[in-house]
Amino acid sequence: MEKNYMTIPYVIEQTSRGERSYDIYSRLLKDRIIFLGGEINDDVANVVIAQLLFLESADPEKDISLYINSPGGVVTAALGMYDTMQYVKPDVATLCVGQAASAGALLLAGGAKGKRFATANSRIMIHQPSGGSRGMVTDMEIQLKETIRLKSILNNIMANHTGQDIKKLEADMDRDYFMSAEEAKDYGIIDKVFSSRE
């Protein structure tokens, strides 16, 4: 299996005391920007949670920006990030660049009200959680109950942030439901579509 290793760019800054180099993500963090790119898993979630907590401790009054380009991933990892976004004192502004699908859409909708954005050509997709199990029937029943419980949690969170009726939301999330940025705005997932910096 071929591994895809991406080169992480470095930025060099000149100061009165000399030069300093940062990897691009650390440089963005200095400006209170967290970039979530790629699939969501426990490792990614732990890094994002740590960044949110660090930025809160650095300045509990100043907004944090979470940029999202994600196809989704592990529901429990996303819920850990979502809960931390709600827990920290600073508002967390969310901005979709590219796509926010599945768990990524949950995080996008979970941004501070009035501070949830998407770029003009972004796509947003919501759906119910997927799961699979194997083994003894009793174990599969346990997994099914847990997946149904997670589905209920996700539906309630999305209904709370979008203002959609829970029955409509459940019907829409029954299968993959794709939206343009404008459609996501009308749906209540975001508050504004950006085409350029203001």
Curated annotation (Swiss-Prot):
Q: Which UniProt keywords apply?
A: Cytoplasm, Hydrolase, Protease, Serine protease
- One Pfam family of this protein, by short name? CLP_protease
Reading the lineage from the top rank, the first entry is Bacteria
**Where does the record place the catalytic residues?**
102, 127
Catalytic reaction equation(s): Hydrolysis of proteins to small peptides in the presence of ATP and magnesium. alpha-casein is the usual test substrate. In the absence of ATP, only oligopeptides shorter than five residues are hydrolyzed (such as succinyl-Leu-Tyr-|-NHMec, and Leu-Tyr-Leu-|-Tyr-Trp, in which cleavage of the -Tyr-|-Leu- and -Tyr-|-Trp bonds also occurs)
The EC number of this protein is: 3.4.21.92
Q: Record's Gene Ontology CC terms?
A: cytoplasm; endopeptidase Clp complex
Keyword set includes Ligase = no
One biological process term in Gene Ontology: protein quality control for misfolded or incompletely synthesized proteins
| Xref: Gene3D superfamilies | 2-enoyl-CoA Hydratase, Chain A, domain 1
Task: Extract the SUPFAM superfamilies matched here.
Answer: ClpP/crotonase
Q: What are the annotated disulfide bridges? A: none
Q: Which GO terms describe its molecular function?
A: ATP-dependent peptidase activity; ATPase binding; serine-type endopeptidase activity
Chief place of localization: cytoplasm
Cytoplasm keyword on record = yes
Q: Where in the cell is it found?
A: Cytoplasm
Q: Which family does it belong to?
A: Belongs to the peptidase S14 family.
Q: How does it assemble?
A: Fourteen ClpP subunits assemble into 2 heptameric rings which stack back to back to give a disk-like structure with a central cavity, resembling the structure of eukaryotic proteasomes.
What this chain does, per the entry, is described as: Cleaves peptides in various proteins in a process that requires ATP hydrolysis. Has a chymotrypsin-like activity. Plays a major role in the degradation of misfolded proteins.
Name the HAMAP family on file: ClpP
Q: What is this protein called?
A: ATP-dependent Clp protease proteolytic subunit
Q: Which organism is it from?
A: Brachyspira hyodysenteriae (strain ATCC 49526 / WA1)
